[in-house]
Swiss-Prot record:
PANTHER family found in the cross-reference section: MANNOSE-P-DOLICHOL UTILIZATION DEFECT 1 LEC35 -RELATED, MANNOSE-P-DOLICHOL UTILIZATION DEFECT 1 PROTEIN
Protein name, entry field: Mannose-P-dolichol utilization defect 1 protein homolog 2
Any one GO CC term of the record: membrane
Organism: Arabidopsis thaliana (Mouse-ear cress)
Cystine crosslinks: none
Record Pfam families: PQ-loop
C-alpha cells in the first residue's frame, strides 16, 4: 500500500494486529514523511529573512557573496535533479529554495544602493550561464563535477557570513527563524540520508550544513544579547 511513494503496508499491518510497528518498519516511514515535510517547509524557509530586510529596509551585516553562492549551489542541485529525471519530491525543495534565494539576493542589491558596477558582473554572468546549466546542455563530465562541487559551494557560502559576524561581533539583519529552519532541515536530512543509505558525499554535505548553520545560529544568539542591552540602555 503506497501513498506518494511511501510504503504504508508494514505499519498498517502491524497496527491491525494490535502491535506497534518494528524499528525496521517505522524508521524508513518516518524518514519518508520527514522528507515530504522538508519540501513543504522549504516554501517558507527564507521568507523570514526576506521580510526582515524589507521591513527594516536594511541589509546591515549581510554578506552578499554568501547569498550569491547559495543561488549557485541551489541552481546546480536543481539542474542535476532535472537532468537525471528525478520526481518532484526529490527536487521540489531545491526549486522553492532557489526562487527564494533569488528574491533574497535581489533584495540585498536593492537595499545596498548604489551597487558597484563590478558587482553587477556576477548576476549578469549567472543569467547568461544558468539557463544552459538548468537545461542540462553541458558536458556530462562537467555536470558531474559541478554537482560534486556543490557541497564545497554551500560551505563557502556560509564561511563569509560566519567571518563577517565574528569580525563585527554582530549578526545585523540575519533572521534567527530562517537559520533555525536551515539548521533543523540539515539535521533531518542527515537522518533521512542515513535511513536511505545515501552516498557518503551527500551525507557529508548535510553534516557540513548542520555545522555551518549551527555556527551562524549560535552567533545570532550570542551577538544579539549585547545589541539588545545597548538598545535598552539607550532608551
Amino acid at each position: 500500500m503506497d501513498y506518494l511513494g511511501i510504503d504504508m503496508s508494514c505499519a498498517i499491518g502491524s497496527l491491525r494486529n494490535g502491535d506497534f510497528p518494528e524499528k525496521d518498519c517505522l524508521l524508513p516511514l518516518i524518514s519518508k514523511l520527514l522528507g515530504y515535510c522538508l519540501v513543504a517547509a522549504s516554501i517558507t524557509v527564507k521568507l523570514p529573512q526576506i521580510m526582515k530586510i524589507v521591513q527594516h529596509k536594511s541589509v546591515r551585516g549581510l554578506s552578499v557573496v554568501a547569498f550569491e553562492l547559495e543561488v549557485v549551489g541551489y541552481t546546480i542541485s536543481l539542474a542535476y535533479c532535472l537532468h537525471k529525471g528525478l520526481p518532484f519530491s526529490a527536487f521540489g525543495e531545491m526549486a522553492f529554495l532557489l526562487i527564494q534565494a533569488l528574491i533574497l539576493v535581489a533584495c540585498i542589491y536593492y537595499y545596498s544602493q548604489p551597487v558597484p558596477v563590478t558587482t553587477w558582473i556576477r548576476p549578469l554572468l549567472y543569467c547568461a550561464v544558468a539557463p544552459t546549466v538548468l537545461a542540462g546542455q553541458i558536458n556530462p563530465t562537467l555536470f558531474e563535477a559541478l554537482y560534486a562541487s556543490q557541497h564545497a559551494i554551500f560551505l563557502f557560502a556560509r564561511l563569509p557570513q560566519i567571518w563577517k559576524n565574528f569580525k563585527n561581533k554582530s549578526t545585523g539583519e540575519l533572521s534567527f527563524l530562517t537559520f533555525f529552519m536551515n539548521f533543523a532541515g540539515s539535521i533531518v536530512r542527515v537522518f533521512t540520508s542515513l535511513q536511505e543509505k545515501a552516498p557518503i558525499s551527500i551525507l557529508t554535505g548535510f553534516a557540513l550544513g548542520v555545522v555551518t548553520n549551527g555556527s551562524i545560529l549560535t552567533q545570532i544568539l550570542l551577538y544579539s544579547k549585547p545589541a539588545a542591552a545597548k538598545e535598552k540602555k539607550a532608551n
